[in-house]
């Protein structure tokens, strides 16, 4: 939503599914004025310290002519208990359309960690200037709420008619604010509409927000609606108010075409004017609830992650008997293939009930005839290529290596097509029961790029994701093309991928990092890809599986 008078409000962020989500609500008090006659137009910019640099992740809307703003735009973040997550809050005056703090617009900042905010729920800190001194008596207050309990979103559309006119030479410029009542009976701003200029019968733009933001997932929680006439000085004229609950809003719009309306009451007029009826009418024209399923909804509903491994055995890896080989089996240090297998597979196996994983090799001559194969079972059992847990994959890899001849070329399409076959059978069920993840470990340039692109485009329409870990120091530019981060991947005939299903990561970027860093990077996109696929097919999660409590046998008599 964008409005030149009320300020710029950015679109809600795209969240990574599967993480805990925290919403931060921000207010400030006693901000420094521009001068004796002019109040600031404040905005708060949130930065997160990540990868050794401060990165902007969110910002509030701009409020005009306000020294003690209460921002309606929530700042949403993913919260990870195992990470420190340092945060900076920069308050600046968005004078003349400024979009970032400058020396002449900077109003102050503060720094803390997300963990500190979450553990205290509410934090009030003084704002500091760039010289480290306090910015007068300016403070910033941050309130944290964890989003939990529901994933419902609400789409609301309001309009009004016959509102009181507050402008002597024109018509009112109405906007509406929505507040929810907190447990301590304080009111929390949850939404502010745009301003509709010069109109006593405004129709505000539809808007969407989470049920948690609207009423803390409590449909009986009181909601307060306040209508104002906008004034550029920041002293908006009060028109009227009314109260409701989300349950009442739902019931009043339950039938198709049904609308709900409230009298907009100014208590001062009601108490003083004998024949006062209302200051206008507000109409709820639309109230729809949208269920947004998460990765955990699907996992808890019975969806299994079917994990398959494909290992590059081409000659470019080097002779395994040499210490310089990428396949060298040193007793002192596991090679990069083994490190990647353990890091990624160790997490994926928790989402597969039988913990049996097909494992294939490509680019090698295999016994007994030593013909080149691009999708052979590394346990040499083509009828049952599955290995017991990741430890079984590693054991099969170690046994396989001395029995094969590394050769070439690096053809990846055959293994993608092989994994796509069961994924296509799964698709035909129309249920969210099994999602395939293929881990490809390779050291070099793909030889069958055209065929691989075609295979990926086909797989993008199936319940399937592909993770490629580049081992060694080769040129991986082709792999980055497959990743699709620079635009949709297309097959040679020009057909685009239905969705981005490939995640490529070079192992060299993580060789000195903890194994968890690699796993976190390569698996980061999988929850989103799972949800995107099933949502695109209109497939809801299964019912949550019932929990079975372990019991202790009674002692024998």
UniProtKB/Swiss-Prot annotation:
Example GO BP: cell differentiation
Residue numbers binding Ca(2+) 2: 167, 229, 231, 237
One Gene Ontology molecular-function label: calcium-dependent phospholipid binding
Cofactor: Ca(2+)
Residues that hold Ca(2+) 1 according to the record: 167, 173, 229, 231
Region spans: Linker region: 244-303
Keywords: Calcium, Cell membrane, Cell projection, Cytoplasm, Cytoplasmic vesicle, Differentiation, Endosome, Membrane, Metal-binding, Repeat
Role, per record: Calcium-dependent phospholipid-binding protein that plays a role in calcium-mediated intracellular processes. Binds phospholipid membranes in a calcium-dependent manner. Plays a role in dendrite formation by melanocytes.
Similarity-based family: Belongs to the copine family.
The protein's name in its UniProt record: Copine-6
Organism, as annotated: Pongo abelii (Sumatran orangutan)
């Amino acid at each position: 939503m964008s409005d030149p008078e009320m300020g710029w409000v950015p679109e809600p962020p795209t969240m990574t599914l599967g993480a805990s989500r925290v919403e931060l609500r921000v207010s400030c008090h006693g901000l420094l004025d521009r001068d004796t006659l002019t109040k600031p137009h404040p905005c708060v910019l949130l930065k997160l310290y990540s990868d050794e640099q401060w990165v902007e992740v969110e910002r509030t809307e701009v409020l005009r002519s306000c020294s003690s703003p209460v921002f309606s735009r929530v700042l949403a973040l993913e919260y990870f208990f195992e990470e420190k997550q340092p945060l900076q809050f920069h308050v600046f005056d968005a004078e003349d359309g400024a979009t970032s703090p400058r020396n002449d617009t900077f109003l102050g900042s503060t720094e803390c960690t997300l963990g500190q905010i979450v553990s205290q729920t509410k934090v009030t800190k003084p704002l500091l200037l760039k010289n480290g001194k306090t910015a007068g008596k300016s403070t910033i207050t941050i309130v944290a709420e964890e989003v939990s309990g529901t994933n419902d979103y609400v789409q609301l559309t309001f309009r009004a008619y016959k509102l009181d006119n507050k402008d002597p030479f024109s018509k009112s410029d109405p906007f509406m604010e929505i507040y929810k009542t907190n447990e301590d009976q304080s009111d929390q701003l949850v939404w502010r509409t745009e301003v509709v200029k010069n109109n006593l019968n405004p129709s505000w733009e539809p808007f969407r927000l989470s049920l948690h933001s609207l009423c803390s997932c409590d449909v009986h929680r009181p909601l307060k609606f306040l209508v104002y006439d906008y004034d550029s000085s920041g002293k908006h004229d009060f028109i009227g108010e009314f109260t409701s609950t989300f349950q009442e809003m739902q019931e009043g719009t339950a039938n198709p075409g049904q609308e709900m309306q409230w009298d907009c009451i100014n208590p001062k007029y009601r108490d003083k004017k004998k024949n006062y009826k209302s200051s206008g009418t507000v109409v709820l024209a639309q109230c729809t609830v949208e269920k947004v399923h998460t990765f955990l909804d699907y996992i808890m509903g019975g969806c299994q992650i079917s994990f398959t491994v494909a290992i590059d055995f081409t000659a470019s890896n080097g002779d395994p008997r040499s210490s310089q080989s990428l396949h060298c089996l040193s007793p002192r240090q596991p090679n990069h293939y083994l490190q990647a297998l353990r890091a990624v597979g160790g997490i994926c196996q928790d989402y597969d009930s039988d913990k049996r994983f097909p494992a294939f090799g490509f680019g090698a001559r295999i016994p007994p005839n030593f013909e080149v194969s691009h999708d052979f079972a590394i346990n040499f059992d083509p009828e049952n290529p599955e290995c017991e847990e990741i430890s079984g994959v590693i054991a099969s890899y170690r046994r396989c290596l001395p029995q094969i001849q590394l050769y070439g070329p690096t053809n990846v399409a055959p293994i993608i097509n092989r994994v796509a076959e069961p994924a296509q059978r799964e698709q035909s069920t129309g249920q969210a029961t099994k999602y395939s993840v293929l881990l490809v470990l390779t050291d070099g340039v793909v030889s069958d790029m055209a065929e691989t692109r075609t295979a990926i485009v086909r797989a993008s329409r199936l319940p399937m994701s592909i993770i490629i870990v580049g081992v060694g120091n080769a040129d991986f530019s082709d792999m980055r093309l497959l990743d699709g981060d620079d635009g949709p991947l297309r097959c040679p005939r020009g057909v685009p991928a239905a969705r981005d299903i490939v995640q490529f990561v070079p192992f060299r970027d993580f060789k000195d990092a903890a194994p968890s860093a690699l796993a976190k990077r390569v698996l980061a996109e999988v929850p989103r890809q799972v949800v995107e696929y099933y949502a695109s097919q209109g497939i809801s999660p299964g019912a949550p599986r019932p929990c079975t409590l372990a019991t202790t046998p009674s002692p024998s008599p």
